[in-house]
Regions:
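Bacterial N-terminal signal peptides that target proteins for export
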Residues: 1-12
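Bacterial N-terminal signal peptides
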Residues: 11-19
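Sequence/structural signature of beta-propeller domains
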Residues: 23-387
């Protein structure tokens, strides 16, 4: 995915400098960013060349490793909460269940693989026995969306063990060349059962899928009563990120480029809605203001300094993190010890810890700095003395 944006801000450039943190010891209303893993030497304590444009993050509540989608290398790589890599890595398939020869390898821009790897985005851990890996009787453990218009599933016990399997292929829907572009993925439950919700940035819709109903094992398109409609979202904006927060679906909207494939960043370019899991609009949560291609959403823990328990919404456009009350009132943006906005270039996921060797009070993030050419996995924590 290429991204329309301006030059890197000075604050964001620090993320991939040789130092290991952004911010300094600060008062409890200040925050520090600590890189854990990057594909660039010197940008974090640990290096992994496959971690390029790190996007979706998921893990099991039982304390599995953090699974991270590597959008530029068609891979899901695994790390503990201190950034130590786990041996397993999973290749995400292209349409037709094709695995690129470049999948799970450091991208070589001078000699790109043919075909290019898949482009995974959102990811969920699946607790349901209903969503199986297609062609098997094995419940999916992790499910992945892609900009290629596919959704795929993986579980232990597959053969080959390191490949996910296509469960939805809308790469040519409605037609070849203008197929779905899935930017985000969430799971939710309503009275009809458990469903997957994928943000289709190209069509401007939320695509909904239930478990397989046929012999091919592919997940079935489903409808909701509400349809995820907000007539007051301006033309040219489309669903971008999505997250299940306390049982409701928070959906971010970003401005589409001419191809309806990528976002157009800019201050005020963004909206956030809250829907129930049957697609009814509950409320407009946030509009324009400091939003700038918002994507990542989480609720902070109750041990997160000044902003404990608040809703955090990260901007992909400028890397800043907006803090909201539950009613959608903007409180502030996260700042470092010097009062500068925390800014993480190419910010994607924000999530509380809970994976292996992590604290559930710590916010973890993924990012694709330098126009999504690189990758970063790290933490955000409150600190105790402002400069």
């Amino acid at each position: 995915m290429s991204h329309v944006s301006g030059c890197l801000k000075a604050a964001t450039a620090v993320v991939l400098a040789a130092g290991l943190t952004i911010g300094y010891a600060a008062h409890d209303d200040a925050y520090i960013v600590t890189p854990l893993v990057s594909n660039l030497a010197g940008a974090a304590p640990k290096m992994d060349g496959v971690l390029q444009n790190a996007w979706g993050i998921a893990f099991s509540p039982a304390g599995s490793p953090f699974w991270i989608n590597d959008n530029a290398t068609g891979c899901a790589t695994l790390y503990d909460g201190e950034g130590t890599k786990v041996t397993l890595q999973v290749s995400i398939p292209l349409p037709g269940n094709v695995i690129s020869p470049g999948a799970c390898r450091s991208a070589n821009h001078n000699n790109p693989s043919n075909p290019a790897p898949a482009a995974p985005t959102g990811m969920v851990w699946n607790a349901s026995a209903a969503f199986l890996v297609p062609g098997t009787t094995i419940p999916a453990a992790f499910i992945f969306s892609t900009e290629d218009g596919t959704i795929s599933a993986w579980a232990g016990g597959l053969n080959p063990a390191n490949n996910a399997v296509i469960a939805v292929d809308n790469s040519s829907t409605p037609s070849a060349g203008v197929g779905a572009v899935y930017k985000g993925l969430a799971l939710g439950v309503n009275v009809k059962g458990q469903f997957l919700f994928a943000t289709n940035f190209r069509s401007g819709r939320i695509d909904v899928f239930g478990p397989s109903g046929g012999s091919n094992g592919l997940y079935m398109a489903a409808t909701t009563d509400g349809g995820f409609i907000d007539h007051h979202i301006p033309a040219g904006y489309a669903p971008f990120g999505i997250a299940n927060i306390d049982g409701d679906l928070f959906v971010t909207y970003a401005q589409q480029d001419k191809q309806h494939h990528d976002d157009v960043a800019g201050t005020g370019h963004g909206f956030v809605d809250v829907f129930d899991t049957d697609g009814h609009l509950l409320r407009r949560f946030a509009s324009r203001g400091t939003l700038n291609s918002p994507w990542g959403i989480t609720r902070a823990s109750f041990d997160f300094g000044r902003f404990s328990g608040k809703i955090l919404i990260g901007n992909f456009g400028d890397g800043r993190i907006n803090v909201f009350d539950d009613d959608g009132t903007l409180i502030d943006q996260l700042e470092d010890a010097y009062g500068n906005p925390v800014a993480i270039d190419g910010l994607w996921t924000l999530t509380l810890g809970g994976g292996r060797n992590s604290s559930s009070d710590t916010v973890y993030f993924s990012a694709g700095p330098n126009n999504e050419a690189n990758g970063l996995f790290g933490t955000i924590t409150p600190v105790s003395h402002r400069k």
